Amino acid sequence: MACCLSEEAKEQKRINCEIEKELRKAKRDARRELKLLLLGTGESGKSTFIKQMRIIHGTGYSEEDKRGFIKIVYQNIFMAMHSMIRAMDTIKISFEVADNEENAIMIRQVDYETVTTLDSQSVEAILSLWADAGIQECYDRRREYQLTDSAKYYLDAVDRIAEPNYLPTLQDILRVRVPTTGIIEYPFDLDSIIFRMVDVGGQRSERRKWIHCFENVTSIMFLVALSEYDQVLVESDNENRMEESKALFRTIITYPWFQNSSVILFLNKKDLLEEKIMHSHLVDYFPEFDGQKKDAQGAREFILRMFVDLNPDPDKIIYSHFTCATDTENIRFVFAAVKDTILQLNLKEYNLV
């Protein structure tokens, strides 16, 4: 009987050891997943960043995937033209060519949210409107209304996009605007570690959905659009977009949930800042700026300092990078540096040594 018990005890001990071994392995495996939370106000470039991760570290976009973007590109073209035609009325600009009044009426009749084709009549009307001096003046005054950053890119490419065998390029896909509603997760494997990138909607109405994303966050990746210093919110036309971004950043970095998460600040759209700073002066919107006019470098350093100064904890380092989310090589380079930072900060915890 004693012998029998001894055998049973041995077997039980073996089973317990196996269970403990499996539990340790499960814990170790769970720790090899890094959760990166992408935050920022609407249109700061979060979704574009996720697309870049898919191109650089994932499977990219197949021909079938690209075809799925055709109608969204068409919708972006019509949406941009609608925005400018509406703004022509609001800011009281006339068309230079009288016929474009008719073209504008025709384009306004197209529902840009459901359009799936780009017919030759619409193409002619869009090309004529885009060439009109009135529309060009309206485009130059785009900070006075809401217009997507990619408007010029698509409108300059209407002839190519209107081709019958059109297939969106990676750049077309990166620039397409689809507001993020809900939460998008994109996991990718890098050196046997899973990076789980979580993109949440940036518009105010989307932010209440973030709360359950806050657990076990390795790093906060906060995006700021450098070019938004002179723009107002989609939701409120008397509030500056960059002030909203600053307020959100201050809230995020002081949240109790994130006290153990590293913070990486992406100052995005540096290309648009370089373009805009030549005619729209930072000092007109941020009087404390004492740098030179038309100095993109000085402007972006000032904006970086504004955000870093919001950090109340002297022991917490804010890691910052200037980015252009539509430039794959720039993002490849920046994310390699970010990955190294994250891994260095988590060597022990994630069993990487």
UniProtKB/Swiss-Prot annotation:
Keyword Magnesium: yes
Residue ranges, annotated region (G1 motif): 35-48
Binding residue positions for GTP: 40-47, 174-180, 199-203, 268-271, 325
UniProt cross-references to InterPro entries, sorted A to Z: Gprotein_alpha_Q, Gprotein_alpha_su, GproteinA_insert, P-loop_NTPase
GO biological process annotation, one example: adenylate cyclase-modulating G protein-coupled receptor signaling pathway
Domain of life: Eukaryota
Span list, region G2 motif: 172-180
GO cellular component: cytoplasm; heterotrimeric G-protein complex
Residues reported to bind Mg(2+): 47, 180
Function per UniProt: Guanine nucleotide-binding proteins (G proteins) are involved as modulators or transducers in various transmembrane signaling systems.
UniProt-recorded name of the protein: Guanine nucleotide-binding protein G(q) subunit alpha
Provenance organism: Mizuhopecten yessoensis (Japanese scallop)
